[in-house]
Amino acid sequence: MNSYESRGHLLTEQVNPQSQNLDQMSALELVDLFNQEDQKTLEAIANAREALAQAIEITSEALMHGGRLFYVGAGTSGRLGVLDAAECPPTFCTPPELVQGIIAGGAGALVRSSEDLEDRAEDGKKAIAQRQITELDVVVGITAGGTTPYVQGALIAAQQRGAKTIFISCVPAEQVPFAAAVDIRLLTGPEILAGSTRLKAGTVTKMALNILSTSVMVKLGKVYGNRMIDVAVTNHKLHDRALRILQDLTDLSREEAAILLEKSQRRVKIALLMHWKNVDASEAEHLLKVHQGSLRTALKS
C-alpha cells in the first residue's frame, strides 16, 4: 500500500455507527459505550483461539530448543510488545534476552510519538539483522491495520533468516494478506474514535500477548499449578509472594518458609524441590537441570 492509496476500506479505519454522536455524549454515556464496545475484544480472542494455540505451541517449542521470542511493532503495537517482554523477567525469572520487544524508533518511541518511523521497512529489516535472529527464533509482528512497513519489513527479514513468524493484526486477511507461520486476526471492528487503534485494537492485542507469553512460560515449566514458582524475588512485594507460595504449597509456617527461601538463595522452585525431595540446593538444581526446569517432572524422579 503506497502513501497515496486510501486506507478507508480497512476495518480499523472505518467509522463506528454506534459513536456517531460521540462529541455530544454525557460522561456516563461515554463509559457505557466504551464498556459495550470493549465486549468485542472477548469475542475476537475467542474467534482467534486456534491461531493463538498454534502460536503458543510453536513459540514454546522454539524456546525449549534455545530460541528467543521477539515482538516487533510501531506506536501502540510496539509499546505493547515492549511492555509484555519487560514483564517476563520479574514474573518468570527469564533472562532479558529471551523475550524482547522491538519498537520503531527505539527506546525514545516509548514515551514520545514517532509515527513517521513506522513507514521505513528497511529499519525493520535492520532491527532483525542487529539482533542476529536465526532459525531458532520466533518473531511476532504486531500491526493493528496490518500494513505497517516497519513490521512487514522485519517479518520478511526474519523469514529470510529462517525464523518462525507470527502475524497479529486487527483487519481481515482478505483486506491485508500476509504469509506467516501463524496468522492471528483479532477483529474488534471500527473504533469508537475512528482510526484510534490504541483503543479496542490495543486492548485486544494486550490480551493476546498476555495469553501468548504466559502460556509459553507455563509450557516451559515456569509455573506449578497456577503459582509463579520462578518469580524473581527482587522487592518486598515479591518476597512476600514467594513466602506465601511456599506456605500455601508446603504448609510451612511463615518463619519456616523464610528460612527455606534463604537456603534456596531466594529461588522458590528450588525451595519447593528441597522441601519435597529432602535434598540440598545443589541437588535440587541438578534435578531441575536434568528435567529441563520442570518441577513437576523432577518431583516424579
Swiss-Prot record:
InterPro entries: Etherase_MurQ, Glucokinase_regulatory_CS, MURQ/GCKR, SIS_dom, SIS_dom_sf. Its EC number is 4.2.1.126. Keywords: Carbohydrate metabolism, Lyase. GO terms for molecular function: carbohydrate derivative binding; carbon-oxygen lyase activity; ether hydrolase activity. It is an enzyme of class 4 (lyase). Pathway: Amino-sugar metabolism; N-acetylmuramate degradation. One of its GO terms (biological process) is amino sugar catabolic process. Residues 59-222 form the SIS domain. It catalyses: N-acetyl-D-muramate 6-phosphate + H2O = N-acetyl-D-glucosamine 6-phosphate + (R)-lactate. The active site is at residues 87, 118. Specifically catalyzes the cleavage of the D-lactyl ether substituent of MurNAc 6-phosphate, producing GlcNAc 6-phosphate and D-lactate. Belongs to the GCKR-like family. MurNAc-6-P etherase subfamily. Homodimer. A lyase-type mechanism (elimination/hydration) is suggested for the cleavage of the lactyl ether bond of MurNAc 6-phosphate, with the formation of an alpha,beta-unsaturated aldehyde intermediate with (E)-stereochemistry, followed by the syn addition of water to give product. This is N-acetylmuramic acid 6-phosphate etherase.
